[in-house]
Amino acid sequence: MCVFINYSHTRPYMNAQNKALDELCINTIRFLSVDAVQQANSGHPGMPMGAAPMAYVLWTKYMRHSPRNPGWPDRDRFVLSAGHGSMLIYSLLHLCGYDLSLAELKNFRQWKSKTPGHPEYGDTPGIETTTGPLGQGFATGVGMAIAEGHLAAKYNKPGHEIIDHFIYGIVSDGDLMEGISHEAASLAGHLKLGKLIYLYDDNHISIEGKTDLAFTENRLQRFAAYGWHVQQVDDGNDLEAIAKALAAARNENGQPSLIAVRTSIGFGSPNRQDTAKAHGEPLGDEERKLTKENLGWPQEPTFYIPDEALVHFRKSVDSGLELEQSWTRSFRNYLDTFPEDGARFEKQLKGELPPDWDKDIPVFPADAKGKATRVTSGVVLNAIANNVPALMGGSADLAPSNKTLIDNENSFQAGTYEKRNIHFGVREFCMTAILNGMALHGGFIPYGGTFLIFSDYMRPAIRLACLMKQHVIYVLTHDSIGLGEDGPTHQPIEHLASLRAMPNLTVLRPADANETAEAWKFAVKSNKGPTVLALTRQSVPTLDRSNFGPAELLHRGAYVLKDVDSTPDALILASGSEVKLALEAAEILAKDGTSARVISMPSWELFDAQPQDYKNSVLPEHVTARVAIEAGATQGWHKYVGMNGKVIGLDHFGASAPINELFNNFGITAESLVLAVQDLIKR
């Protein structure tokens, strides 16, 4: 049941003395934000000015956090989805005693500061996720709530609740306009994620003007329809109403909560409050002066922090240590009582792989008919999942095709949070951001599957995973025109090139079953960024490794798969399903007396990271007759074949037809390779 609670008239938050202290603390947040934006001559002052009261209540009355140990496992998480209001969280972090100095606040938006324009995970202690692209923080928080729910269901015992925390966030009008928030809110409501509580900064202002220019639906009814617990606070400065709403949300265990707080952007600014001018530019010296006068704040010094306010905020240091120490005592008791579960929990949180985690991964025998690499991927996934409890994920409603289900494991649903198969629905963008949230929470190696073509829907969240260097695995199947009859709407062309262009992303396109197994091993072990597994729909031969280079060399990005007795006349480079064609071409060429070395190149990124000596051993500089083949865009391959080399690929869209007709008509064939090599040698 979804209940609307409207807090319009409430009693004072506390007595007069405490009320004065509250106002002092709130204005401290406001003017640290105003001064930082003004000094940088860049930024967004309006949101922190309006949202300061609700953030203050949350951080000082409800948030369980430890400024001296921002990574304490059972802390509450806070996601500022409205990342443009970054000075709000920077001010809170400094005031509460995190390792973020006043000098860093004064260095807002400057080179190498810990206070970038939008919050960045890893740069600033206390920042739980990078935000800024609106809507993504909303969905990332859903991922954190899924993580909390799973760990709690798996490890908590009666009287031993070692995982019991909330995921809080502040979301904006812009967040709720973005489509990803619809996806994520729908799934969160379905899953009944009661530990998820979002404060909605309902200020009715966007960059272009009032939100009713483009945003007029009833947001509260929308969230109620999603299955959320919905409340409304009519006055963003009513601390008591905000506190009561948060208390009610915390008590609502069966639904995620949205608290719409009617705020005033740029609060206190005589000429900017409740206008678009307050959103994305400094107030200006004159308006800052008027605002300080209006709210009774001293003009000088800038970045002024009253001692009384700082003392009040810094209580978070001692209270945080007490909370953390209490949890540590509880966990020690848990370890004594449940030593095996406790040890597993510690290793899972630390990201440690169990000994022999890969022991069940098979070595696949040679098979001329073979299997699709997506099918092999499903086998390997299950072999790993048996021994790696941190591996958890699912698909955007394509699990039977992506082969992403963990066998003998039921679905993650309300009431079965201990299970590991997540059904994301047809929500690729939301899925990808949720994976980020799970990884950021800690304790997980999350994975998500869909067709490679739909990585377009995932891209913004993949990009944030790369920016944050998160350990996430993307299982992207149906990776070429090999998809066949579904046609060009579903056949990826430019997608591999697009993904390879993204920093910190490793793209793996394995050629056969054993390369697929090695690709999964890499993806599970690699914790320096996300990994793409690009997998075929169609079957590919499983190579006889007694006759070819070992599949373990996948970890070097490219390797000599089939060599010749003497210096090769030509080099043929290929990835994935086209490796078979490269081998066929080499055999044809050999019959005519042309020796061609075949190089399997599943990962450009891994190969580029190798020592130059190794790269030269695979691609000898003196062999200039080079041809690459891949059933996708040719962009980028000339880095390896040279400007005089040839690339056989597709720089146009596909068509609807059976797979063999497509490959033949588009020239993705062994015969095309042979002609290309012969032409280069003749030159």
Predicted feature locations:
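A short, small-residue-rich loop immediately preceding and capping a beta-strand
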Residues: 40, 76-77, 127-130, 160-178, ...
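C-terminal structured domain segments across diverse proteins
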Residues: 459, 463, 473-475, 480, ...
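A glycine-rich helix N-cap at a beta->alpha junction
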Residues: 98-108, 188-201, 224-228, 465-480, ...
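Conserved acidic/glycine
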Residues: 13-52, 171, 175-176, 197, ...
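General beta-strand structural signal in soluble alpha/beta enzymes
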Residues: 80, 169, 178, 198-200, ...
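Thiamine diphosphate
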Residues: 110-122, 130, 146, 150-153, ...
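Cofactor-binding active-site loop characterized by glycine-rich and histidine/acidic residues
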Residues: 50-191, 405-406, 434, 438, ...
